[in-house]
Swiss-Prot record:
The keyword Transmembrane helix belongs to this UniProt entry's keyword annotation: no
Name of the gene: ANKRD20A2P
Stretch forming the signal peptide: none
SUPFAM superfamilies registered for this protein in UniProt: Ankyrin repeat
Name the record gives this protein: Putative ankyrin repeat domain-containing protein 20A2
Record's keyword annotation contains NAD: no
Superkingdom in the source lineage: Eukaryota
Amino acid sequence: MKLFGFGSRRGQTAQGSIDHVYTGSGYRIRDSELQKIHRAAVKGDAAEVERCLARRSGDLDALDKQHRTALHLACASGHVQVVTLLVNRKCQIDVCDKENRTPLIQAVHCQEEACAVILLEHGANPNLKDIYGNTALHYAVYSESTSLAEKLLSHGAHIEALDKDNNTPLLFAIICKKEKMVEFLLKRKASSHAVDRLRRSALMLAVYYDSPGIVNILLKQNIDVFAQDMCGRDAEDYAISHHLTKIQQQILEHKKKILKKEKSDVGSSDESAVSIFHELRVDSLPASDDKDLNVATKQCVPEKVSEPLPGSSHEKGNRIVNGQGEGPPAKHPSLKPSTEVEDPAVKGAVQRKNVQTLRAEQALPVASEEEQERHERSEKKQPQVKEGNNTNKSEKIQLSENICDSTSSAAAGRLTQQRKIGKTYPQQFPKKLKEEHDRCTLKQENEEKTNVNMLYKKNREELERKEKQYKKEVEAKQLEPTVQSLEMKSKTARNTPNRDFHNHEEMKGLMDENCILKADIAILRQEICTMKNDNLEKENKYLKDIKIVKETNAALEKYIKLNEEMITETAFRYQQELNDLKAENTRLNAELLKEKESKKRLEADIESYQSRLAAAISKHSESVKTERNLKLALERTRDVSVQVEMSSAISKVKDENEFLTEQLSETQIKFNALKDKFRKTRDSLRKKSLALETVQNDLSQTQQQTQEMKEMYQNAEAKVNNSTGKWNCVEERICHLQRENAWLVQQLDDVHQKEDHKEIVTNIQRGFIESGKKDLVLEEKSKKLMNECDHLKESLFQYEREKTEGVVSIKEDKYFQTSRKKI
């Protein structure tokens, strides 16, 4: 997702997150998500779009699965004809997709300027925002299209629109390092004083993202260089923390120009204030001011100060008050003060004080005896003066050390705060780079600490060196009074007559000098008090800033801990879900193996049933053939017997009767044998029919799953029942014929016993022949029934095979559906 945080050094990871949102050539289009009108809009087929609208006018604003209309897809693909067609049909122009992007935003995102112009001319709103809070102008800034931005602004786009990170298009152009767009937006009067969520100004962001060209443009626009963010850091602090010396020099030069302008404006008022102090007289100050000067200065100066002290003027004032102001100190390149007084009023007072001391030295008369005594007293007081100077200088050295310590600690604290606030804020880095970023921040903090320690050591060495130089200077000043006393003695010897005149002039010069010094002392005291108040205010401000930074650090640490806990919880939850899925996968695999085994077993059972059925059918056909052959043989034997009987003579009736009785007995035996075989075959058929019924019952249990095949099965079963009924009728008729045959046999027996005439025999034979014909008719009917039974069995077998295939396919479909639902 989009994160406009500034987490990496000069915005590298933030730039990557921005690119993730703003780059891309359009939508990811899947054909399954689109309707016909959407496919035509993607292809740019205006004729097909018009046909779709003619068929169904409701497709004009139809949405796909990603909530995109045909206008969205046409704008993303840059098809101007389709866009004009849809707009002329008065479709919804400001409809939003799943990312809350309008067709105008999508056209600007894909840099389709012609489509964007058509939408703007037909009243598209350029100030609508997507889910990231970006307007069409933000996307135009990213693509660095000034023409698109110009058209958006001319159609009412808000130039100060804010995204989710409170970035205006100008700030966003600075983040993306789009120098051309920065110049364009500033020409269109975009506000250069806008700030983001962390209250960072445009200049701070330009420094942060290492854009010296943009910094130069902003400085030309007279941007506020002294503006501060939430943590109290300005643009120069950003340049120092990121080691950007070039940008730091640009900012310093701009600050110097601003200070020069302010000094030129304030100079006249400072000179008037100094002239008022020069008009002060000697009586306006108490006599104890000169004695208490050092004490007052010591009390006014705080122990730790962060502002520079007026060191040069303070030293000169001490020398003059302590009696060492007879001559100016020798200038040395190594003795330059480390801090300079920026106030022009104080500089003017110090310069005028030095001029007065020089004049007093030039106007000194030749010393008389009183002057010699005074010099002797001053020589006696010289060790005390030396001790005072030494104490003052040692205090100055300690004070400068405290200043160095405070500045170094403040710098280190500021850098660590900058690292903490600027680097651990949750929007600064992506979650994947968090550990690497923490390591980098620790390394940078350690480097900054080492740099601060090195600076402290260097400053300490410089202070020690300056202390030695001050000691040498004090020794030289101690020798100056002795030399001057000798010179004064020689001058007194030469100029004794003019002693009174020179004494009067000397007193007058000293009085004037005293007035000037008192005025300078008052100025310095007031300045010291103001500096003290400023330092106290700054200390309070720094303490408040430190508290705020500590609170923010604590909040950020809590946020980091919460994030870590959430990450661990989500990882644990995902691990549990993964384990559950693995277990379910193993269970499903086991079920699949069981299903495969059961399927194989059922297939084997079906094959065995098929083989058994085929064997039973073949046995049944063989038995029918044997029965048919037996019947034919019986008919042949009957025909032969009839022919023999007809050809035999009447005289041989007894022999023929005996022969017939023998034949009848033989045929009866054969008939009985055939009857037994018929019974056996019938029993076997019954068994096989029972087996078929069991198979049909098994099949009926499986057929309950499919409702459509049930009717066919019932019809087939009804036909089988009819055939079995017919078969039972045939059996009953066969039994009836057997009974008739038995009755005929009994009649033959009676004939043999009674020895009746041939007519009875012929009648019996005729009845036997008729019964044979009836048997043939019954056999034909039984053949037809057997054929019907075979046809029904074949249809049943085919039906069972189709049914098993359908059941297997249904089971497989159900299994895959259940497995998909579980997954």
